[in-house]
Amino acid sequence: MSPSDGDFEIGTDGPSVILVGVDDSTTSLRAGWYAAGLARRQGARIVSVFVAPMASFGMSGPGGAALAVAKDEAFRSTAEEMELRAAVIGDELGISITFIAAKGDPFSEICRIADEVRADAIVVGASAHAGHKLIGSLAVRLVRANKWPVTVVP
């Protein structure tokens, strides 16, 4: 295998930038802790990414504006809580954690941010949604993107 066979850097001991996808799920929290431990052992930094999916329906008509404001406030509140949690974990373990919150399609946003921060690896929690067996989970879509090593934490 030659260096031109892929985009992965050869000659390093491990990732220097680990992107971890987070939300409020139990598997996401486990993924965050796994990534934090990996970063501590490897001397890497973490980019913790929270993406709120944007619904394309329900915003028009009576009450649509109020619903949009409520969803935006919930997004901000959740993002602030996650950013604080990330800062506490970073301080506790002595690792650098950058928190990024975004809105949109989780797959597209994680890919975009991973490219921007030049992530060497991605860590996500396994999906518990039954529908993902039909359309594919975020983890499967990230693996199929074939751009980064992806670790899926159960």
Each model region followed by its residue ranges:
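Conserved beta-strand positions in the Rossmann-like core of class I SAM-dependent methyltransferases
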Residues: V47, T98, T151
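Structural beta-alpha unit
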Residues: M1-D13, V88-I122
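Small/aliphatic-rich secondary-structure junction motif
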Residues: D7-A65
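Short glycine/serine/threonine/alanine-rich loop segments
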Residues: A44-R45, I95, A119, W148
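A short acidic, glycine-rich active-site loop
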Residues: A66-E81
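Short secondary-structure boundary segments
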Residues: F50, G125-S127, P154
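Short, hinge-like loop/turn segments at secondary-structure boundaries
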Residues: G63-L67, E116-R118, V140-R141
